[in-house]
Design a protein with these regions (language model features):
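Catalytic machinery of carbohydrate-active enzymes
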Residues: 1-276
């Protein structure tokens, strides 16, 4: 959430972002949060979470129109469908689109590619993620990159967070060519232009795949421990799951072995998407 401001800084439709990082955990915080909400004199509030605390805080803040998911129904909540339905009701529209237009300055986009040969096919390697059970693994990524480098012209953006430098180091130390750029030492605002000018995303379910998908870029997302609903909203998401698994059954706690997704299979998918 703290990075959201950087992610949408260039969007002309967003006037202001107010980040509330306190008073959202305990029941007693309802009263403190309501005072903050009341200060802004909101006419409407839309809450994309079935939170009793937020609902009561909004009521105490005398906000006239409160839109929220059905309370006490968190289990089985489909993130995309629930958000879509709530937005349609709030805006009084039908069939709210789930694809969006991602805004970024043209100068930032141009700067991100000025040192990359225009003949190269640029691939984001999304090696980082929210937790170890969702990761395909550094070894698999380095093997994939090396295999691709034997048959094509590529440039790779190694996408890992600042706390995932060890993963990045492990990938880079096993590469046979120097056609890559590390992104772990860059801020989110610095990273985004590289993602938006790439040709393909390959990696774990992470923020990078959402940025690329919403930039109209094909995104191959490896699902090992994430619900399919996380990637249901975009036509640019293409899920990779182990053979024999039902995608609807994969969710938090599945703990599927990353080695069940073979490098050769991912390589074949990349070559196919490269042609198309």
């Amino acid at each position: 959430c703290k990075n959201f401001k950087d992610a949408v800084e260039d969007d002309p439709l967003i006037k202001e972002i107010i980040f509330l990082d306190r008073y959202t955990k305990k029941f007693i915080h309802i009263f403190k949060l309501s005072k903050i909400l009341k200060k802004y004199k909101f006419d409407n509030i839309i809450i994309y979470y079935p939170s009793v605390r937020l609902y009561l805080a909004a009521r105490l803040a005398n906000i006239d129109h409160i839109s929220i998911y059905p309370l006490f129904r968190k289990k089985g909540l489909h993130l995309v469908n629930a958000a879509k339905k709530l937005t349609e009701k709030f805006l009084n529209i039908e069939n709210c689109p789930t694809e969006t237009e991602y805004f970024i300055k043209k100068s930032d986009l141009n700067n991100s590619i000025k040192n990359v040969n225009s003949d190269y096919f640029k691939i984001v390697i999304g090696a980082g993620s929210s937790g170890p059970t969702t990761r395909w693994g550094a070894k698999n990524f380095s093997n994939l990159i090396n295999k691709l480098n034997t048959n094509g012209k590529y440039f790779f953006y190694i996408l890992c967070g600042p706390n995932e430098k060890k993963i990045e180091d492990e990938i880079v130390s096993n590469l046979n060519k120097d056609n890559f750029l590390r992104l772990s030492d860059k801020s989110l605002k610095e990273v985004i232009p590289f993602l938006c000018t790439s040709n393909l995303y390959i990696g774990n379910d992470s923020f990078g795949s959402h940025i690329t998908a919403q930039s109209g870029i094909k995104s191959l997302v490896i699902l090992l421990d994430s619900p399919k609903s996380y990637t249901d909203y975009s036509k640019n998401h293409h899920r990779i799951i182990p053979k024999g698994y039902n995608i609807s059954k994969i969710t938090h706690g599945s703990n599927i072995s990353p080695d069940l997704i073979k490098v050769e299979d991912v390589y074949s998918l990349v070559k196919n998407f490269e042609k198309n």
